[in-house]
Amino acid sequence: MAVQGFQRRLLGSLNSTPTAIPQLGLAANQTGARCLEVSIPDGLFLSLGLVSLVENVLVVATIAKNRNLHSPTYCFICCLALSDLLVSGGNVLETVVILLLEASALAARAAVVQPLDNVIDVITCSSMVSSLCFLGAIAMDRYVSIFYALRYHSIVTLPRARQAIAAIWVASVLFSTLFIAYYDHAAVLLCLVVFFLAMLVLMAVLYVHMLARACQHAQGIARLHKRQRPLHQGFGLKGAVTLTILLGIFFLCWGPFFLHLTLIVLCPQHPTCSCIFKNFNLFLTLIICNAIIDPLIYAFRRQELRRTLKEGLTCSW
């Protein structure tokens, strides 16, 4: 089997010409001379993937080691790290296999290569979907902890968290299997795009509401201690910057990939869209970058997790 038949790179079937979406592919002379294609070296792609793997393995191992971190919040963080780990691992594995095939160091047998490609695509796609779900779950967990603080432990119990986690994983695997099987149907692509937009809106609404509550709380404290208003304004500005960074990273890392899916449906033959299609590997690299950033935002900022990680690393040395 030719190497090109395996080079899909995570849903890479979208990077080729789907049969049910007519004439997605364009001839090279139709894309125009000004088409910008950002080439991602395999070495850089592998390096980012390995960094993400190490980070997320540390998060999962640290949470598993410390029983004090077996709360619903840390369960969601652990599952997010596991999802990001699978995203990175799937891409790294696929890239390594592609490089081995290109170097003729691995025999390309259709009976083995194609099923392996399908398995990698399902694992990577399901981990991407679950990663988005767990980002939403973490946002909802924080929201409940702020607005229902007194009832939090009765609302977000460990059994309920485990049920939610199991439901997310099962739904992610089922949806991803259908997506890989019917990737050439526009409705399937649109469902995935709508899912991303729903997660984006959910996170934006929850975090904006949490920021507003935090500002009100800071204002109340300032009035209680007869502080000056600039203190409250400074707190609000800091919170707004944090919120912008949080949602901005999410949108910048995930948005281009889902823009790619949207354009496949809306303008498969337009030269400008075809130029965007050429940067598919760049969009995957941004997702890997998100898998690197997630532990920094959601895991390593927590003091208990950092302390456990430090103790583990110290003992290992």
Curated annotation (Swiss-Prot):
GO terms for cellular component: plasma membrane. InterPro entries: GPCR_Rhodpsn, GPCR_Rhodpsn_7TM, Melcrt_ACTH_rcpt, MSH_rcpt. CDD domains: 7tmA_MC1R. It is found in: Cell membrane. One of its GO terms (biological process) is adenylate cyclase-activating G protein-coupled receptor signaling pathway. Interacts with MGRN1, but does not undergo MGRN1-mediated ubiquitination; this interaction competes with GNAS-binding and thus inhibits agonist-induced cAMP production. Interacts with OPN3; the interaction results in a decrease in MC1R-mediated cAMP signaling and ultimately a decrease in melanin production in melanocytes. Signal peptide: none annotated. Receptor for MSH (alpha, beta and gamma) and ACTH. The activity of this receptor is mediated by G proteins which activate adenylate cyclase. Mediates melanogenesis, the production of eumelanin (black/brown) and phaeomelanin (red/yellow), via regulation of cAMP signaling in melanocytes. The gene is MC1R. This is Melanocyte-stimulating hormone receptor. Residues 64-72, 141-163, 212-240, 301-317 are cytoplasmic. It comes from Hylobates lar. One of its GO terms (molecular function) is melanocyte-stimulating hormone receptor activity. It is a multi-pass membrane protein.
